[in-house]
Amino acid sequence: MTDRVKKTRKLRGHVSHGYGRVGKHRKHSGGRGLAGGFSHMKTFFTRFHPDYHGKRGMRVYHRKENSDYARPISSARLWGMIPKEQRYDFLDNPEKVPVIDVREFGYHVVVGGKLSLERPIVVKARYFTPSAKEEITKVGGKWIITY
């Protein structure tokens, strides 16, 4: 419900307007900046900034990310990496065999999984699991290790 008269109009004649005699709505009542994160503003920090306090991990300057982590992909998803128009060309012409370099898509390791199409396929990657090798060779395809 809206008020006919603002609060400031109601407080005319009351010197401090509800802000007290000494402080008079001045200075930094809650501390400056982000002060009080562990005491009087703790609820605010835990609700809106839960990771503000404390440490989290460590930066390793000399680590080579690529050698530490190689993103895997299932061999079941290999046919899905070929654009639709090209995929239909390969399905219509059995002599054509697609060559997929998974590193172009940001993957490095091919893991096992049933191929979605029982057609030969050539796959290039940094590493293949034994089950992935078996699955690719079973349909008459080839796997090539690239560095």
Swiss-Prot record:
A Gene Ontology molecular function term of the record: structural constituent of ribosome
Signal peptide (from-to): none
Alphabetical list of SUPFAM superfamilies matching this protein: Ribosomal proteins L15p and L18e
Keyword Nucleotide-binding recorded: no
Region (Disordered): 1-34
GO cellular component, one term: cytosolic large ribosomal subunit
Compositional bias segments (type: Basic residues): 1-15
InterPro entries for this protein: Rbsml_uL15_N, Ribosomal_uL15, Ribosomal_uL15/eL18, Ribosomal_uL15/eL18_sf
GO biological process terms, semicolon-separated: translation
Protein name: Large ribosomal subunit protein uL15
Protein source organism: Encephalitozoon cuniculi (strain GB-M1)
